[in-house]
């Protein structure tokens, strides 16, 4: 399994729609950077946020998730409460090839502020907008910015095709279009 370079990422995005919209090169200057990098792609977050709140004193249960645990916000910035988290989604829509696995890691700009981006791997054959969880590990409110970078996606090409890909097993998050809550 090898990591893929910018040339491959660009070709797959432009010829096969792997990333839409695709930004060829790094956008910087007054923003948290995003776009194509040497061995990855820095993704942006949309202006749709689900901010965790415990106003209903709910118990978090992934098998029976209560959507009232979140407050929906549509804005250019999102304030994450201290020691809490927010769910958001990417601006980019991904179509992952059958022989590729993607791993997503947070950007150091946010990590240095105590904000941690968590995303599970993008499995072979998966497509959709990526739901991202951003944790505020600090005792202070923290700000994140829509339409700017949040994490970097790394693309790994497998040595052979899997017997069963995500789309073959009708994965529960296949084709997700918005911020998606836990499903069983």
Curated annotation (Swiss-Prot):
It catalyses: dCTP + H2O + H(+) = dUTP + NH4(+). DCTP binds at residues 107-112, 152, 166, 176. The keyword DNA repair does not apply. Pathway: Pyrimidine metabolism; dUMP biosynthesis; dUMP from dCTP (dUTP route): step 1/2. Transmembrane segments: none annotated. Gene3D superfamilies: 2.70.40.10. Its EC number is 3.5.4.13. Keywords: Hydrolase, Nucleotide metabolism, Nucleotide-binding. GO terms for molecular function: dCTP deaminase activity; nucleotide binding. The keyword GTP-binding does not apply. InterPro entries: dCTP_deaminase, dUTPase-like_sf, dUTPase_trimeric. GO terms for biological process: dUMP biosynthetic process; dUTP biosynthetic process; nucleobase-containing small molecule interconversion. The active site is at 133 (proton donor/acceptor). Catalyzes the deamination of dCTP to dUTP. HAMAP family: dCTP_deaminase. Belongs to the dCTP deaminase family. Homotrimer. This is dCTP deaminase. It comes from Herpetosiphon aurantiacus (strain ATCC 23779 / DSM 785 / 114-95).
């Amino acid at each position: 399994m090898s990591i893929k370079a910018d040339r491959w990422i660009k070709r797959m995005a432009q010829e096969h729609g792997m990333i839409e919209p695709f930004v060829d090169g790094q956008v910087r200057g007054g923003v948290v950077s995003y776009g194509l990098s040497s061995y990855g792609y820095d993704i942006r977050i949309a202006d749709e946020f689900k901010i965790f709140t415990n106003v209903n004193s709910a118990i978090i249960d992934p098998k029976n998730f209560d959507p009232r645990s979140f407050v929906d916000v549509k804005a250019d910035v999102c304030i994450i409460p201290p020691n809490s988290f927010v769910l958001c989604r990417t601006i980019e829509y991904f179509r992952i090839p059958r022989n590729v696995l993607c791993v997503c890691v947070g950007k150091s700009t946010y990590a240095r502020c105590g904000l941690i981006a968590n995303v599970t791997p993008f499995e072979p054959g998966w497509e959709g907008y990526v739901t991202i969880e951003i944790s505020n590990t600090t005792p202070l409110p923290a700000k994140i910015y829509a339409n700017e970078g949040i994490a970097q996606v790394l693309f790994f090409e497998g040595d052979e095709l899997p017997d069963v890909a995500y789309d073959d097993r009708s994965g529960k998050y296949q084709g997700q279009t918005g911020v998606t809550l836990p499903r069983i």
